[in-house]
């Protein structure tokens, strides 16, 4: 099994993790927040964590909570990500759901997307980003010259993505507020084709009209539909964060839904902590039929 990690961050760093928490630096601000995967003990002492953390997330329910500041910091700030010719910006915010507007481990896929879109021997490759959140993958694809369609079921998240596009000095991403599965089925009926499809589906979710999404129930269906959307020259990136799935399950889903899969990368995504621990953050399958 392969291990994949983001190696080009300057504005982000995982400092330590353990005891169901993680300590992270986003720009100049250090956050302490829950991490269900961190089952081991912390490597740094509680005293060190308290000294380093600018703000801590306090869980108040199963899905929400509040931030307690140890130092006077802004509720909103920006960080940048650079990789070769790629230079993008993210607007971060302390949300009541413990998220800040970015999943830093996904930078490894931004690099892949940026490189792969540039290699496509197609004028303005068509790229579809599903469950797209605040749009890191959309920004990478757009910066590489792609014609990008960004789909998410939450309007506020789409607005956040648009701010990131503008902060990154990019333009003309197509925004779609819709349930991803419904959108894909409609695109299949229309006979649409895409050179690249990216999806990072949640374990659970609710669509624009209350549609319930459960990863294990719907992943095979959406991949079967997506297989009809890939153009002759194509790539696919599938990232999932669910304790119920494994790289072998992803491999079976890919091999049974897509024909003649080439250059398949398969494995676990992680972040390296400053303290020496590896934090697992989902599993990844990606492939392309583009010659190197």
Residue ranges and their predicted role:
Residues 10-24, 31-104, 111:
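Non-catalytic substrate-recognition/targeting regions of SAM-dependent transferases
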Residues 104-122:
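Conserved alpha-helix/loop element of class I SAM-dependent methyltransferases that forms part
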Residues 123-133:
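Conserved class I S-adenosyl-L-methionine
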Residues 134-146:
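Conserved SAM-binding loop of SAM-dependent methyltransferases across substrates and taxa
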Residues 147-152:
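Conserved SAM-binding motif I beta-strand of class I
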Residues 154-198:
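S-adenosyl-L-methionine
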Residues 155-157, 177, 194-225:
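Mobile active-site "lid"/loop adjacent to the S-adenosyl-L-methionine
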Residues 233-292:
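C-terminal catalytic and target-recognition region of SAM-dependent MTase-like enzymes
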């Amino acid at each position: 099994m392969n291990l994949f990690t983001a190696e080009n961050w300057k504005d982000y760093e995982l400092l330590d993790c353990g005891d169901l928490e993680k300590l992270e630096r986003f720009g100049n601000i250090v956050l302490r927040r829950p991490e269900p995967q961190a089952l081991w003990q912390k490597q740094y002492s509680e005293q060190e964590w308290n000294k380093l953390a600018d703000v801590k997330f306090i869980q108040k329910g199963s899905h929400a909570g509040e931030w307690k500041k140890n130092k006077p910091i802004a509720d909103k700030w920006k960080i940048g990500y650079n990789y070769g010719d790629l230079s993008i910006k993210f607007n971060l915010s302390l949300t009541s759901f413990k998220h800040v507007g970015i999943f830093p481990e996904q930078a490894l896929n931004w690099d892949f997307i940026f490189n792969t879109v540039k290699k496509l021997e197609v004028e303005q490759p068509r790229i579809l980003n599903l469950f797209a959140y605040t749009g890191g993958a959309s920004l990478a694809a757009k910066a590489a010259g792609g014609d990008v369609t960004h789909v998410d079921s939450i309007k506020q998240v789409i607005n956040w993505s648009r701010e990131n596009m503008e902060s990154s000095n990019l333009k003309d991403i197509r925004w779609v507020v819709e349930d991803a599965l419904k959108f894909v089925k409609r695109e299949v009926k229309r006979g649409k084709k895409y050179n690249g499809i990216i999806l990072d589906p949640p374990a659970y979710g609710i669509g624009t009209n209350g549609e319930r999404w459960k990863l294990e129930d719907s992943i095979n269906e959406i991949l079967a539909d997506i297989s009809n959307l890939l153009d002759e020259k194509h790539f696919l990136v599938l990232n999932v964060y669910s304790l119920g799935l494994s790289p072998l399950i992803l491999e079976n889903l890919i091999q049974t839904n897509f024909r003649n899969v080439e250059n398949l990368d398969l494995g676990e995504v992680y972040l390296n902590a400053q303290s020496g621990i590896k934090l697992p953050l989902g599993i990844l399958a990606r492939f392309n039929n583009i010659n190197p």
